[in-house]
Design a protein with these regions (language model features):
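Acidic, low-complexity Ser/Thr/Gly/Pro-rich repeat segments typical of extracellular/periplasmic
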Residues: 18-182, 186-189, 194-200, 212-220, ...
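Acidic carboxylate motifs that coordinate Ca2+ or other divalent cations, activating on Asp/Glu
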Residues: 206
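An amphipathic, aromatic/His-enriched active-site/gating alpha helix that lines ligand/cofactor pockets
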Residues: 209
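Bacterial N-terminal signal peptides
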Residues: 7-17
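Positively charged n-region of N-terminal signal peptides that target proteins for export
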Residues: 1-5
Length: 294
């Protein structure tokens, strides 16, 4: 009997251990490495460039998430660019006519991720110029709801070099950016000058204000500038202990802390409810005392 029982018990234990999915191999460590750019055509920062198609190649298969919500081209494109992915390549085809002597930026935000784990490339902006120079100034800040100071996501923030009051409704912005989930924006590729700063929900995608859209604006004119600065950079020996604290040189772009308060303009429709006049009675008003009876 013992010769039969023990082999039977052993077979049951083996079956249970094989049926337990948690006891198998875990497939190795999770990949947290973002995709890496290996080639860009035209090259990053190209000058005098007339090509309207940009190709970016990576070291692994990538995909683009929520392109219409995250990717924005500046100067603004009335006709949305074509964005395609093919294996390790992303291509952007600009359909609008390129302006002469203009710096173009394509802000991908965190839209580019690897195909398997979805690790984002990070805040990547591709830059080229149709002229001999590249404008490098930046303007940054936040857009909050005026009534509760909550961040506003997806607002279009733009600069106007035309300081006329009518430019906001009659012309598209010179340079644009889009707010992220924290309400933060960063307008890049700005040339030196004097600007008005606006933000709008831009429901129809024409980069100008239309009645009914949420808006925000700065009361003061903006003059972008930059200066050489340093910041502390911490190197960690592990997750707890600091190994080294060193100073790093960088270019500080200003202004970098602008605050715009977004609101919806109230335009209630007014109707005439009633008119009243006492019978056989009339009032006459004059701008100054009369010296004689008319």
């Amino acid at each position: 009997m013992k010769n039969v029982f023990f082999p039977f018990l052993l077979s049951i234990l083996l079956f249970l251990s094989c049926a337990n999915p948690g006891s198998g191999p875990d497939g190795g460590p999770y990949d947290e490495t973002p995709p890496r750019i290996v080639r860009m055509t035209p090259s990053f920062g190209a000058k005098g460039e007339k090509a309207k198609k940009i190709t970016i190649e990576f070291d692994e298969i990538v995909k683009v998430e929520n392109a219409q919500e995250k990717i924005i081209v500046s100067p603004p494109q009335i006709e949305m660019p074509e964005i395609k992915t093919s294996g390790r390549k992303i291509s952007v085809n600009l359909l609008d006519t390129l302006k002469e002597n203009t710096t173009y930026t394509i802000d991908f935000s965190d839209a580019i991720v690897d195909n398997n784990e979805g690790n984002p490339l990070g805040n990547f902006t591709y830059v080229f110029s149709t002229g001999a120079e590249i404008d490098t100034l930046e303007v940054a800040g936040h857009v909050l709801q005026a009534e509760d100071l909550e961040p506003v996501k997806g607002m279009i923030v733009g600069l106007h070099s035309d300081l006329a009051d009518s430019a906001f409704v009659s012309k598209p912005f010179d340079r644009v950016a889009r707010t992220d989930g924290a309400g933060h924006f960063s307008i890049k590729g700005v040339k030196p000058g004097k600007y008005f700063l606006y933000a709008l929900s831009d429901m129809d995608g024409d980069y100008r204000y239309q009645r009914g859209e949420k808006l925000a604006f700065s009361r003061d004119t903006i003059r972008p500038y930059c200066f050489a600065d340093t910041r502390n950079d911490t190197l960690w020996a592990d997750t707890v202990r600091i190994d080294t604290v060193k100073q790093v040189n960088f270019t500080h772009y200003m202004p970098d802390n602008l605050l715009l308060l977004a609101f919806s303009e109230q335009n209630p429709t007014r109707v005439l409810l009633k008119t009243e006049r006492e019978p056989e009675y009339m009032k006459v008003y004059f701008t100054s005392p009369s010296t004689h009876i008319p």
